[in-house]
Amino acid sequence: VLARERERALTTRQRELLDQLGAVFDGGFADLTMAGLAARLNCSLRTLYELAPSRDELVLVVVDRNLWRIGRTAANAIDPDMGPLDALRAYLRAATEAVSGTTQAFARDLAAVPAAQRLNDDHSAYLIAVAQSLLDLAVERGDIDPIDTAAL
């Protein structure tokens, strides 16, 4: 995966390629090769290898970028003036809408790559932690009755 600093240092062309790869991966990525991707994206193999040292690493970069995009979309849906329950609704609605475009082919291939599945699990755990913290805040403010928010 790309460190956030490295992501910020990407050229415009590299960002465009990663965006295009996200769209390509929607059709599934298990059978894609670096050479096939380079031909499809009209770029050199060297350009792809500058993004990641292997096909498997490139898969992780693209998946991680997609998951971060979903997370940013959800976080940006929260208005600082919202109460915790409204913020939770907005956050979960935005996250749900962001993942609604996930294709069966992408989900199938994601499940078949253990490292990509771990990335997905990590991002899901973060989403759950945000939801729990918003519920905890709602309990603290008296918006909802005291409950064990970790159980939800």
Regions found by a protein language model. Give the residues of each.
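N-terminal intrinsically disordered/low-complexity leader segments
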Residues: 1-15
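Short amphipathic alpha-helix in the helical subdomain of ABC transporter nucleotide-binding domains
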Residues: 10, 14, 146-152
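Helix-turn-helix
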Residues: 12, 20, 27-57, 61
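Hydrophobic/aromatic residues within well-ordered alpha-helical segments
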Residues: 13, 55, 62, 66, ...
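Short hydrophobic clusters on alpha-helical segments that form packing/core surfaces
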Residues: 17-25, 66
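Hydrophobic alpha-helical connector segments
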Residues: 61, 74-101
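Amphipathic alpha-helical packing segments from all-alpha helical-bundle domains
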Residues: 68-71, 115-141, 150
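Short secondary-structure transition hinges
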Residues: 93-130
